[in-house]
């Protein structure tokens, strides 16, 4: 999350939090950064995400069998990586629902 300083009319300084970039807009580099943060103990598979050009949009569509086809053959490792992907998918869904509620779009 980014932060920017805003000066109000009363010369009080407050901090406004900006939203992170939407996962759908992530580049391969963004996905690799996410991978290192959330799946850092499985470094042996990190390059598979780069080799397969996994962007944010692709990350949210990955399935267990996709991971296996990519080369994540160890069942436990694949399950752990898949769990992190599902968590990210849920976070993305929650943010979208909140946006719709905020804008009263149903």
Curated annotation (Swiss-Prot):
Subcellular location: Cytoplasm; Membrane
Membrane topology designation: Peripheral membrane protein
One Pfam family linked to the record: SAM_2
SMART domains to which the protein is assigned, alphabetical: SAM
Residue intervals of the SAM domain: 26-91
Gene Ontology biological process terms in this record: cell surface receptor protein tyrosine kinase signaling pathway; compound eye cone cell differentiation; compound eye photoreceptor cell differentiation; epidermal growth factor receptor signaling pathway; eye photoreceptor cell differentiation; positive regulation of ERK1 and ERK2 cascade; positive regulation of Ras protein signal transduction; visual perception
Principal cellular location given in the protein's record: cytoplasm
Keyword annotations from UniProtKB, A to Z: Cytoplasm, Membrane, Sensory transduction, Vision
Keyword Membrane: yes
Molecular function (Gene Ontology), one example: scaffold protein binding
Family annotation (PROSITE patterns): SAM_DOMAIN (PS50105)
GO cellular component, one term: cytoplasm
InterPro entries named among the record's database cross-references: Aveugle-like_SAM_dom (IPR039144), SAM (IPR001660), SAM/pointed_sf (IPR013761), SAM_domain-containing_protein (IPR052268)
Additional comment: 'Aveugle' means 'blind' in French.
Biological function: Required for normal photoreceptor differentiation between Ras and Raf for EGFR signaling in the eye and for mitogen-activated protein kinase phosphorylation. Probably acts together with Cnk to promote Raf activation, perhaps by recruiting an activating kinase.
Oligomer and partners: Interacts with the SAM domain of cnk.
Listed name of the protein: Protein aveugle
Source organism: Drosophila melanogaster (Fruit fly)
């Amino acid at each position: 999350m980014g932060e920017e300083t805003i000066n109000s009319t009363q010369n009080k300084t407050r901090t406004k939090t900006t939203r992170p970039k939407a996962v759908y807009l992530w580049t391969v580099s963004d996905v690799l950064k996410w991978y290192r943060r959330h799946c850092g103990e499985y470094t042996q598979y990190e390059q598979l995400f780069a080799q397969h050009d996994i962007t944010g949009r692709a990350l949210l569509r990955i399935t267990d069998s996709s991971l296996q086809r990519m080369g994540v053959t160890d069942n436990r490792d694949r399950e752990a990586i898949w769990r992190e992907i599902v968590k990210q998918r849920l976070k993305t869904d929650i943010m979208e629902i909140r946006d719709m509620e905020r804008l009263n779009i149903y």
